[in-house]
């Protein structure tokens, strides 16, 4: 039997799709890249914005037209969590609905017709399904916490993923060792508030924090690099930043989700920090790690965002000069505080602001790329590049998170760490050769 999985959204969803495949492999399902040949089609959904939800029902309609006569369609993930049985009403071709915290129950629901499984289980026994058999890969996703206790006014995640619980460190270390023995060189640690790790366990455990976990993971033989997403700026205190800077295996790239550069908007968003506080954290980080790569999220058009508020966001963009920007127009979500507000920034205003923000960021990337020429980086080889079956190089990421295309006729295997020199750039992209060539 064959299964096709369409994955939308964040890294947590990618990890959930891996889990779905692992569970289904026990039932002799094999993954296929062609939905027309699948016996089971799964759509792993995202509900952070409205656009992916609209896309969901369009995809369901397309899959219903092309699927095999007896093939089933299942909807999983965050949209499944908050819409539940309403999905079955809107899309009769769907056979079952499986929430974001119910992935391990896929083997139960595929044999039921019109099943809905979205209830959240907070018992520690649920940890057993956080780890599962994974195929060998250089870069592995590793969950360290589930859920979110923050109450940001715009965000539906606490409703779809449940309250925040940290996975016991001994279980995480055991899984990381297994991944290392299977060839993993880089870990990507996952959590909705990943750097708040240790704030709450579902039962009594020794007091540890995120920095403690990073140090322990760094001791595992075979693990060369550690990244993590998504942290919250509130938990980036001096102690964390200092240990982040000192740990040689922790990559010197970090996600710092700003959301808005306006203190007034940040207060409405319930983010818990101000523009000045955020800039102070960036200043402290850059003092410790001058070459650090910083990515961020920015929402434009949040209710009541004024022209002055948006200019504050542009000011932060200029001061920080983010290496990566994920930017969106505000999307009202159900089960959120802001979703009930009547105030709305006109779409044409929001669209204009987004365009200006993104255009300026593209310019910043080009300016930063020029400064990279002549610099050296150590790249973890992710993929070989071939033309007409001839090796022409490889691609991968630097310690600071820069994606680099490397020209090299020598065979370099995925997982190798290679020193390269930047020789050119184009539209923010970096090209390099191996050091000494």
From Swiss-Prot:
A molecular function (GO) term: N6-isopentenyladenosine methylthiotransferase activity
SMART domains found in the cross-reference section: Elp3
Keyword set includes tRNA processing: yes
Reactions the enzyme catalyzes: N(6)-dimethylallyladenosine(37) in tRNA + (sulfur carrier)-SH + AH2 + 2 S-adenosyl-L-methionine = 2-methylsulfanyl-N(6)-dimethylallyladenosine(37) in tRNA + (sulfur carrier)-H + 5'-deoxyadenosine + L-methionine + A + S-adenosyl-L-homocysteine + 2 H(+)
The protein's required cofactors: [4Fe-4S] cluster
Domain TRAM: 370-436
One GO CC term, this protein: cytosol
Pfam families registered for this protein in UniProt: Radical_SAM, UPF0004
Residues reported in the UniProt entry to bind [4Fe-4S] cluster 1: 10, 46, 78
EC number: 2.8.4.3
Taxonomy, superkingdom: Bacteria
Cofactor: binding details: Binds 2 [4Fe-4S] clusters. One cluster is coordinated with 3 cysteines and an exchangeable S-adenosyl-L-methionine.
Domain Radical SAM core span(s) in chain numbering: 134-367
Domain MTTase N-terminal: 1-115
Keyword set, alphabetical order: 4Fe-4S, Cytoplasm, Iron, Iron-sulfur, Metal-binding, S-adenosyl-L-methionine, Transferase, tRNA processing
Binding-site residues for [4Fe-4S] cluster 2, renumbered to this chain: 148, 152, 155
Compartment(s) where it occurs, according to its Swiss-Prot or TrEMBL record: Cytoplasm
InterPro entries for the chain: Elp3/MiaA/NifB-like_rSAM (IPR006638), Methylthiotransferase (IPR005839), Methylthiotransferase_CS (IPR020612), Methylthiotransferase_N (IPR013848), Methylthiotransferase_N_sf (IPR038135), MiaB_methiolase (IPR006463), rSAM (IPR007197), rSAM_horseshoe (IPR023404)
Xref: HAMAP family: tRNA_metthiotr_MiaB
Family to which this protein belongs: Belongs to the methylthiotransferase family. MiaB subfamily.
Role played: Catalyzes the methylthiolation of N6-(dimethylallyl)adenosine (i(6)A), leading to the formation of 2-methylthio-N6-(dimethylallyl)adenosine (ms(2)i(6)A) at position 37 in tRNAs that read codons beginning with uridine.
Assembly with partners or alone: Monomer.
Protein name listed in UniProt: tRNA-2-methylthio-N(6)-dimethylallyladenosine synthase
Organism: Helicobacter pylori (strain G27)
Gene name of the encoded protein: miaB
